[in-house]
């Protein structure tokens, strides 16, 4: 039996070190799998998502797009700020964790890291009204995507604004970094669209 953590976002995912195995696993896991040819006109860059990338990451991203595709179309994804979308994701996920996971935590009192425990405390304070407001924002966001993106569109953008953090940073610093990364990683989950994450670029310190 699989127990939910956050049913709005819990989904099947898998890892692979190469494209061939990624495809094979997809054919196993996904029903009615059909291969389709991706046309370049359907590959889009969401300018509002990448506007505040680290300069080095942004430069590598645009250089890669120019080398690989040439002249990809740029689109405005949404009227919402990335921070609003990330907060929306956190509230929905946090409230559902509050219902699904916190009762077990309270009952068995397992040993949990300080950083994870702080997220559980945050989840405990999320109200039903906050959750409903976030669900409504998510619906409006998806509606915007349906209007702004042509059918069969594929968005391409980095899922982190900078290189991986250096080890040894404080919990507070890591929490702020994680909030910023969430602005990029929440898009797939909030939009209910599949995503593929590929480690592609390196930052100033040559960290992935």
Predicted segments, located by residue:
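Fold-level recognition of mixed alpha/beta catalytic cores in primary-metabolism enzymes, strongest
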Residues: 1-46
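Conserved active-site and cofactor/substrate-binding residues in soluble primary-metabolism enzymes
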Residues: 9, 17-24, 56-60, 92, ...
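Generic secondary-structure signature for well-ordered alpha-helical cores
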Residues: 20, 27-35, 66, 70, ...
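Residue-level signal for inorganic ion chemistry
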Residues: 22, 101, 156
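Gly/Ser-rich, acidic/histidine-flanked active-site/gating loops
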Residues: 28-94
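Acyltransferase
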Residues: 58-75, 102-107, 130-152
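Short helix-loop capping/hinge segments that flank enzyme active sites or metal/cofactor-binding pockets
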Residues: 88-137, 199-207
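Glycine-rich, small-residue loops and helix-cap segments
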Residues: 132-208
């Amino acid at each position: 039996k699989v127990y939910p953590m956050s049913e709005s976002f819990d989904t099947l995912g898998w890892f692979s070190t190469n494209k061939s195995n990624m495809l094979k696993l997809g054919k196993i896991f996904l029903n009615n799998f059909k291969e389709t040819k991706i046309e370049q006109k359907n590959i889009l860059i969401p300018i509002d998502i990448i506007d505040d990338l680290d300069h080095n990451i942004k430069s590598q991203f645009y250089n890669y797009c120019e080398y690989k595709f040439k002249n990809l179309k740029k689109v405005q994804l949404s009227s919402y700020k990335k921070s609003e979308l990330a907060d929306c994701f956190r509230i929905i996920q946090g409230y559902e964790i509050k219902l699904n996971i916190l009762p077990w935590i309270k009952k068995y009192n397992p040993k949990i890291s300080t950083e994870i425990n702080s997220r559980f405390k945050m989840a405990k304070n999320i109200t039903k009204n906050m959750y409903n407001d976030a669900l409504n924002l998510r619906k409006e966001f998806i509606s915007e995507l349906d209007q702004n993106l042509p059918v069969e569109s594929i968005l391409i953008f980095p899922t982190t604004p900078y290189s991986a953090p250096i080890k040894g940073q404080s919990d507070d610093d890591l929490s702020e970094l994680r909030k910023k990364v969430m602005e990029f990683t929440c898009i797939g989950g909030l939009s209910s669209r599949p995503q593929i994450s590929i480690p592609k670029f390196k930052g100033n310190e040559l960290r992935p």
